[in-house]
């Protein structure tokens, strides 16, 4: 939520940012907010004047009572003032509701470094890491996507898509999952179960080393939390509601972690607060019909380790870079080649002031795909959830800044491992960093092994 004081003092800044985001239909909202706010403040001034007048009448009534003078006329006048105050307060409540309607639906103000663009095609790659394995048939598109800034080795055989390789390594059963639950669900099997759990523990260990507190949050939250952390459009497109309950399945542990300190005033000396959330994530994936219909890349349910930070406003941009660095270190340790993308205004989402994505190179698909999202939401979520801090007991509280970033989303990391570490015979090598966690170094095709998890 945006501070109405900022709209009041600098409406052109807000309008300019809405134009950058392509939210042109909301420009008139700013003018309406200003008109409503002006009327609200005029009413408030009148209420205060009427209260002062009524207080004077109360004093006069007291004096006349003592002297035995008539007070009926003064009491009548006082009652009329009280009624007028009540009328204006009701009007102001209606005005406040209208203002809040707009404020709750305005996006965050973007950082000056966010590129202006209409959609994901105008996101800007800013950094590349690793050495990609590139099938010769994908070389031209790879060079275009990597801008010639990434190391690579060419392979002559075409890697299999993860969806095609999954049954060959006994990694998942999507057909039976579709029978039981519908599309975009999966049974994870054999080594991939161990790999999934290993990725969680690996990422968690990395974050614990950096001072993050591990948290398994509630998997359902109340509506006020969802309204506080995300845009209203997500209620239709992303979030599952529990029928008959004021509860929603979490699409990411970011949401319960943001709600964890709602309506609290934090001790500034304890900032930053660093949480590493571990949870399943549940997403409708509405609006993605036809996209990634095979395999486990875009699914309704998956596991994720999430970084979440409550920071001082003056430190939040530094923490944004640190969260990105943490995620990069995880993918570098896994030896998965990637690029960093600065998300443009048209693809940013309402909550974030700036967002980076890490996109892993998918050798079989021949393109980069999102595996990490790293956002600074500044005070947008904190205002909605009323999360403040102060350094001294009598100090006026300030809103914290909230930040979040994927550490690892296991299903997408598994896809990246399968596509980048497969051999021509269908064997999938395990990144060395995971060997102490998995207990095996490769996943053999089903027809080449006797049992699961052979080391």
Swiss-Prot record:
Protein's recorded name: Serine--tRNA ligase
Organism: Thermococcus sibiricus (strain DSM 12597 / MM 739)
Record: residues binding L-serine: 252-254, 306, 406
Record keywords, A-Z: Aminoacyl-tRNA synthetase, ATP-binding, Cytoplasm, Ligase, Nucleotide-binding, Protein biosynthesis
Pfam families registered for this protein in UniProt: Seryl_tRNA_N, tRNA-synt_2b
Protein family according to the UniProt entry: Belongs to the class-II aminoacyl-tRNA synthetase family. Type-1 seryl-tRNA synthetase subfamily.
E.C. code: 6.1.1.11
Gene3D superfamilies with a match to the protein in the record: Bira Bifunctional Protein, Domain 2, Serine-tRNA synthetase, tRNA binding domain
Record's keyword annotation contains Cytoplasm: yes
GO cellular-component term (any): cytoplasm
Localization, UniProt: Cytoplasm
Pathway: Aminoacyl-tRNA biosynthesis; selenocysteinyl-tRNA(Sec) biosynthesis; L-seryl-tRNA(Sec) from L-serine and tRNA(Sec): step 1/1
Keyword field contains Phosphoprotein: no
Native organism taxonomy: Archaea, Methanobacteriati, Methanobacteriota, Thermococci, Thermococcales
Swiss-Prot/TrEMBL catalytic activity: tRNA(Ser) + L-serine + ATP = L-seryl-tRNA(Ser) + AMP + diphosphate + H(+); tRNA(Sec) + L-serine + ATP = L-seryl-tRNA(Sec) + AMP + diphosphate + H(+)
Superkingdom of origin organism: Archaea
Domain text: Consists of two distinct domains, a catalytic core and a N-terminal extension that is involved in tRNA binding.
GO function terms (MF aspect): ATP binding; serine-tRNA ligase activity
Function: Catalyzes the attachment of serine to tRNA(Ser). Is also able to aminoacylate tRNA(Sec) with serine, to form the misacylated tRNA L-seryl-tRNA(Sec), which will be further converted into selenocysteinyl-tRNA(Sec).
Principal location: cytoplasm
A GO BP annotation: selenocysteine biosynthetic process
Binding-site positions, ATP: 283-285, 299, 370-373
Subunit composition and interactions: Homodimer. The tRNA molecule binds across the dimer.
């Amino acid at each position: 939520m945006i501070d109405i004081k900022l709209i009041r003092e600098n409406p052109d800044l807000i309008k300019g940012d809405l134009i950058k985001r392509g939210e042109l239909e909301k420009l008139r909202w700013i003018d309406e907010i200003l008109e409503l706010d002006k009327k609200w403040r005029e009413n408030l001034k009148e209420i205060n004047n009427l209260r002062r007048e009524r207080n004077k009448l109360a004093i006069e009534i007291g004096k006349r009572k003592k002297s035995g003078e008539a007070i009926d006329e003064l009491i009548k006048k006082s009652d009329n003032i009280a009624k007028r105050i009540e009328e204006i307060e009701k009007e102001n409540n209606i005005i406040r509701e209208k203002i809040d309607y707009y404020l709750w639906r305005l996006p965050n103000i973007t950082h000056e470094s966010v590129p202006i663009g209409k959609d994901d095609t105008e996101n800007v790659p800013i950094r590349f890491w690793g050495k990609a394995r590139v099938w010769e048939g994908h070389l031209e598109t790879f060079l275009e996507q990597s801008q010639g800034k990434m190391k690579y080795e060419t392979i002559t055989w075409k890697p299999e898509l993860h969806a095609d390789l999954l049954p060959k390594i006994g990694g998942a059963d999507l057909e039976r999952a579709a029978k039981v639950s519908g599309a975009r669900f999966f049974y994870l099997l054999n080594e991939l179960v161990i790999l999934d759990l290993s990725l969680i523990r690996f990422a968690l260990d990395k974050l614990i080393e950096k001072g993050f507190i591990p948290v398994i949050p509630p998997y359902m939250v109340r509506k006020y939390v969802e309204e506080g952390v995300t845009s209203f459009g997500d209620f239709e497109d992303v979030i599952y509601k529990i029928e008959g309950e004021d509860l929603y399945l979490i699409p990411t542990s970011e949401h319960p972690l943001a709600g964890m300190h709602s309506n609290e005033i934090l001790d500034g000396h304890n900032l930053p607060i660093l949480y590493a959330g571990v949870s399943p994530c549940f997403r409708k994936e509405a609006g993605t019909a036809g996209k990634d219909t095979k395999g486990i890349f875009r699914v309704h349910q998956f596991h994720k380790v999430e970084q979440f930070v409550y920071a001082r406003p003056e430190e939040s941009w530094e923490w944004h870079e640190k969260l990105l660095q943490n995620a990069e270190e995880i993918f570098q340790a896994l030896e998965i080649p990637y690029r960093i993308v600065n998300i443009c205004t048209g693809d940013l989402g309402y909550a974030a002031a700036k967002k980076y994505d890490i996109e892993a190179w998918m050798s079989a698909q021949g393109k980069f795909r999102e595996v990490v999202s790293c956002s600074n939401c500044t005070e947008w979520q904190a205002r909605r959830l009323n999360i403040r801090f102060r350094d001294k007991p009598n100090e006026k509280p300030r809103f914290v800044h909230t930040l979040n970033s994927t550490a690892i989303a296991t299903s997408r990391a598994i896809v990246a491992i399968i596509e980048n570490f497969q051999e021509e015979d269908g064997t999938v090598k395990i990144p060395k960093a995971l060997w102490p966690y998995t207990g095996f170094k490769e996943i053999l095709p089903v027809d080449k092994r006797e049992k699961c998890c052979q080391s």
